[in-house]
């Protein structure tokens, strides 16, 4: 992670180039955030302390990038920016905050899992399946969100929007299945019962941030409508 690339001298001379440098760092931040999500999944599945420590280290890197890129973008904002660069600036500022929040949610998830594992307890196989499915959806969405952020590609934006709707629906159904297990007394762990809904909510919130990132640039367009005429395609 080379932060020396965020050279303040470039800002005054070539603000558009400085924005490109910042964007590359945000893409790097996105890749680190994906890696954090992957290690959350690994920790959940294997209970590996190495994976848990990796999440913590990656989250520290995400926080550092958030701070340094934000400072760099603030310098850029003081320069005269054309319309395109202004949109890039606002999209960049929003996206780094969404990535930082995903990093926080990754830490939340590892803490929930750790609370269960420290009690020598575990999740039911059905609960595990739902959590893994949602983590997998989050990782796929984040990958596509970063492509949408980079390329402003409508197909990737639609992909993320579509899957965010699917994630919301899956979250609702997973909660219903959990309530059924508690009612039937097939989910016996007290700590799992007390944390499971929070885990699902954190996973759903990651999806929300992915959608924000995917739409970050397009939302700066005056005529952009987040639902863009694709609702009919979703309902087919």
Segments (PLM) and residue ranges:
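Cytosolic, long alpha-helical scaffolding segments
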Residues: 1-236
């Amino acid at each position: 992670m080379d932060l020396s690339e965020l050279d303040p001298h470039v800002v005054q001379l070539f603000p558009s180039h400085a924005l490109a440098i910042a964007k590359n760092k945000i893409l790097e931040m996105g890749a680190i955030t994906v890696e954090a999500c992957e290690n959350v999944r690994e920790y959940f599945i294997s209970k590996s302390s190495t994976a848990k420590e990796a999440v913590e280290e990656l989250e520290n890197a995400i926080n550092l990038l958030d701070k340094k890129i934000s400072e760099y973008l603030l310098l850029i904002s003081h320069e005269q920016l054309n319309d395109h660069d202004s949109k890039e600036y606002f999209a960049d500022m929003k996206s780094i905050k969404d990535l930082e929040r995903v990093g926080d949610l990754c830490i939340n998830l590892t803490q929930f899992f750790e609370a269960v594992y420290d009690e020598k307890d575990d999740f039911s196989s059905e609960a595990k399946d739902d959590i893994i499915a949602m983590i997998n959806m989050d990782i796929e969405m984040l990958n596509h969100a970063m492509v949408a952020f980079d390329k402003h590609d409508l197909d990737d934006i639609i992909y993320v929007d579509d899957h965010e709707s699917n994630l919301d629906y899956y979250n609702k159904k997973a909660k219903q299945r959990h309530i059924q297990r508690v009612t039937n007394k097939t989910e016996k762990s007290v700590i799992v019962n007390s944390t499971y809904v929070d885990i699902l909510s954190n996973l759903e919130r990651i999806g929300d941030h992915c959608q924000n990132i995917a739409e970050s640039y397009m939302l700066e367009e005056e005529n952009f409508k987040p639902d863009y005429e694709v609702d009919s395609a979703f309902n087919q």
